Amino acid sequence: MYKQIFLCLIIAALCATIMAEASALADADDDDDKRYVRGMASKAGAIAGKIAKVALKALGRRDS
C-alpha cells in the first residue's frame, strides 16, 4: 500500500515539474514557440498519465 502511495506522489511531482518547466519556457516572444512548448507539455502530461496507469496496474497485479 505504501509503495502505491509513494509511486503516486513521485508521479505527481514529476508531472508538476514537467508542467512548471514548460510554462516557464513558454514566456518567449514568439507565439510559435509558445504553441510548441504547450504542445510538448500536454504530450508529456499524457505520457506521464499513461505511465502512471501502467505502473498502477502492474503493482495491482503483483499484489494479487
Swiss-Prot record:
GO cellular component, one term: extracellular region
GO biological process entries: defense response to bacterium; defense response to fungus; killing of cells of another organism
Residue numbers carrying Leucine amide: L59
Signal peptide from the UniProt entry: 1-20
Family assignment from sequence similarity: Belongs to the gastrin/cholecystokinin family. Magainin subfamily.
Residues passing through the membrane, by range: none
Main localization (coarse): secreted
Residues of the propeptide: 21-35, 60-64
Protein name: PYLa/PGLa B
Domain of life according to the entry: Eukaryota
Subcellular localization: Secreted
Keyword annotations of the record: Amidation, Amphibian defense peptide, Antibiotic, Antimicrobial, Cleavage on pair of basic residues, Cytolysis, Fungicide, Hemolysis, Secreted, Signal
Tissue expression per record: Expressed by the skin glands. Synthesized in the stomach and stored in a novel granular multinucleated cell in the gastric mucosa. Stored as active, processed peptides in large granules within the granular gland secretions of the skin.
Functional note: PGLa and PGLa-H display a broad-spectrum of antibacterial activity against a range of Gram-positive and Gram-negative bacteria. PGLa also displays antifungal activity against C.albicans ATCC 14053. PGLa-H shows moderate antibacterial activity against the multidrug-resistant methicillin-resistant S.aureus (MRSA) but exhibits very little hemolytic activity.
